[in-house]
Amino acid sequence: MIEKIRKNYLSFLLCCMSIVPAAAIAAGGPVVELEIINHLFHPSELIVPANTKVKLIVYNRDQTPEEFESYELNREKVIMGGQRAIIFIGPLAPGEYPFFGEFNPRTAQGKVIAQ
Amino acid sequence: MLHPWFKYGSQSGLPLAAILFLPALVLADGVVVDRVYDPYVQPLEKELEWRSLVVGDAEDPALDRLQVHRLGVGYGFSDRWSGEIYLIGADGGDSELEVEAAELEAKWQLTEQGEYAADWGLLFELEKEFGENQWEGATTLLALREWGRWVGTANLALGYEWGREIESEWETELRLQGRYRLQESFEPALEFYVGEDYRGAGPVIRGSHRFTGARSLTWEFGVILGLDGVSPEQSWRLLVEYEFF
């Protein structure tokens, strides 16, 4: 009896170990990080998988706020100085999607490349 | 929004009893046509907003040429909350345009844009008419979903109005918008409105222009046509919004 319970318990553990990571990957999706330093985006080109929703984490390392802005991505998000923001983009068809920092549009330029 | 049709009825000398016994007309609460709200909030963003509605109904002189204007000042307090204060004026055609009510509005962004199948928010409104002891409060569920360049937005409002000279009542409104993101300066849309004794639908166009210094001007213009015999024939709406930091 005890052996049977032990086997079932092990089977349950193995089942959980196989399911949990798969679920985490499915729920999480790709994560891409972007930094704002001295009113510049780093990196200025982000390569993301096409036709997939992507979680973009933007860290604003400057002390002043910046606005991530892109009509092509249909996203607009103010990131306060010294803070971070999460922006979900996509699923995107293959192509290039420019974005800029609305508070410093001359310097803060970048693009998302979906491929 | 308070009932400008009710206000017009009061100002034009219609007996109160007549107003109370014409629920289909007066307590349509009427001006259901308004902007369709998205659920998003931008911290630090300030805005000046002017909204105008002009009703045309040749079959009903009491409603024909009714104008409602709203002037608002707003601010994004955080990445979740924004607030706006409005002054509301009405002009029944014969009477002078004057400020008749004020409204407080708070928007709560519930989810990150694009995180789920739809984006969600809540809008809270409280309006007080100056001349009469008349109030209205409403909570509106805001939902938005993208399908590529298409954007669908739904506003479902539950409101309660009360005052000495009106019958207190609950009311609901549904506002729907389907918009195509053609280009930033020009986006065509279709809107559909359902409220108590109102059904209307019609085309709307909108656009935005960006200025230097993170300033932008957004405009919306359209006409909503009544879909039944009770609803006004046309409701022309215009919105101009200046956003800055």
In which residue ranges do the predicted regions lie?
Chain B
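N-terminal secretory signal peptides that target proteins for export/translocation
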Residues: 1-8
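Transmembrane beta-barrel domains of Gram-negative outer membranes and organellar outer membranes
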Residues: 28-245
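Cleavable N-terminal signal peptides
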Residues: 15-16, 26
